[in-house]
Amino acid sequence: MQGTVNSERLKFDAEVGKVLKLVIHSLYTNKDIFLRELISNASDACDKLRYQSLSNQDLMDAGSELKIVISVDKDKNRLYISDNGIGMNREDLINNLGTIAHSGTQKFLDAINSGASSQQGVVELIGKFGVGFYSAFMVASEVIVESCKAGESVGYQWKSSGDGEFVISQLESDQVSRGTRITLALKPEECEFVDKFRIEHIVTTYSYHINYPVYFLNDKGEEERLNSEAAIWTKAKDEISAEEHQNFFRTVAHVGGEPWMILHNKNEGVIEYTNLLYIPSIKPFDLFHPDRKCSVKLYVNKVFITEDNVQIIPQYLRFLKGIIDSSDLPLNISRETLQNNKIIEKIKRSLVKRVLSELKKKAESNIEDYTKFWDNFGSVLKEGLCESMNTEFREELISVCRFYSTHSNDSLISLEDYIERMKPEQNNIYYLTGNDLDSIKKSPQLEGFVSRGIEVLLLVDPVDDFWTNVVTDYQKVPLRSVIRADEDLEKFSDVEKDDESKESQNEDAQSKEKVDKFISYAAQVLTNLVSNVRVSKKLTDSPVCLAVADGSMDIRMERFLREQKQLNYKSTKILEINSKHPIVSKMIDQYAENGENAVLCNMLHLLLGQACILEGEELQNVSDFAERMNNVLSQIN
């Protein structure tokens, strides 16, 4: 540290103590950021010199390297940050480091104390004060700034303990170098910040991609570089090699494999930002972990801000990896209060629109490749459909969703594909939810639809039970579960029964009375176990199935809510009976000939149990079910 002359003690505004207290104890929640702020200021100083040297080449020696150097003195518990940027003279030191004493300070405090100002308004007010520099007082009992402005030969020192005043002095030496050197006399409890590895971690985390090299001066007097050569996202698309993408992807994604998709865009509209985002080709193991956080890092002018405190990427796009860098966000204290930032919201909407647009292009151009993405992240993407407030991009989101169906075998289809294949008399998009594709294809619920050539979506992700209760239609075509769509089938001809003779139809009409009586008997036997018993129009091969009335909760959703202790009752379902099934047909004939008996009663209970098992419902009384089964089996001759 150099000697000084002509010292002058100046006072901050009377309220500066309150402001410093707010900055140190309230606005910054992470002490590490003091170094980020000082490095950012040093980078700005280098930027200013580079810009001004374009019009005045004498300010900067040809070929000289603009850089930032960090060094420590462990014995004195001191940390030094130096740059050879534009530097400051006496007037600059007073104005730049004394900005906090401007008349707006009291207004700022009034806004904080009254709570009348919006969070964003307060953030913008903070941006006027150069508060980032003062974050150094979180860790330092004294801050000393020595600086010499480019083109001048006299250097000055600014010194303060953050107690409401500062001292300005002239440096004695006439051999001062251009630039600025900040000395932090660290508090005893902050000795961790003279540790080289701690400093390297902070630089790597927050300042890895700034424009200028950041060096650490080691014990041997050697400068070790701590940051990257350049921010890859600042390059043009065609200047980034596949190897560079692969290396950066591994750095930000922490997953194996190659990126399935790369989204590199520079937005220069109302909001300026650059995004370099990757969609992995491998699903992360913790994709559905409840504590999983966003993996997209937010930068401001290549300075890392956060990846935790801001929802710049919605949860349903959490498979995205990479960075977003904006020059429209303030590079100051606002990084701690970005949650309700209007600029962030605009960037978020723009990104969502871009990502969904690129996914749609891929789905339409290469369904085989898109299927790989869908198998990994389709269930996550559909989470966006569950958000009742997320209506802005709902149509776009559904358009990139793909589904299995009774028509497509094992290939995926879009809802546009489904609508194009709808029958002329069909008014609904039909779907069925289940646990897996193999079992759902065998569901009795599908029989009547398949026999009539009506396509049904097969939804097998847990999230499907949720979004189908939020999204009611697509392109004005209602979505309808086959579990509650029995009555719809009357208007469709059964392709397997079109050759049925009028004689057979007359016989059916004559047997209707027997069927009705049996249905009434079944409803009486199963009183309190089901809400209704009716003849099914959807069953062709199975004897029975469960159904729910319109307006009732889906069976799987109700079961999920019960399991999560969010529902404390179990509703009674409708039992649908296939009167044409051989077993049921014999039961109808027996009842018509002999009336009620114990065997028929047991068989009705067993059929209800079968229907429950097929829908994944628990039997009310397993022992009773087994006893009835044994009684019926004992009747076999």
UniProtKB/Swiss-Prot annotation:
- The segment annotated B runs over 336-559
**Pfam families in alphabetical order:** HATPase_c_3, HSP90
Can you state the subunit structure given in the record? Homodimer.
Q: Which UniProt keywords apply?
A: ATP-binding, Chaperone, Cytoplasm, Nucleotide-binding, Stress response
InterPro entries for the chain: HATPase_C_sf, Heat_shock_protein_90_CS, HSP90_C, Hsp90_fam, Hsp90_N, Ribosomal_Su5_D2-typ_SF
* Region span, C: 560-637
Per the UniProt record, the source organism is Ehrlichia ruminantium (strain Welgevonden)
Cellular component terms, GO, for this chain's entry? cytoplasm
Coarsely, its chief localization is cytoplasm
- Family per record: Belongs to the heat shock protein 90 family.
Its protein name is Chaperone protein HtpG
Mention one GO molecular function: ATP-dependent protein folding chaperone
The UniProt annotation puts the region (A) at 1-335
Where it sits in the cell: the answer is: Cytoplasm
Give the gene symbol.
htpG
Q: What's this protein's function? A: Molecular chaperone. Has ATPase activity.
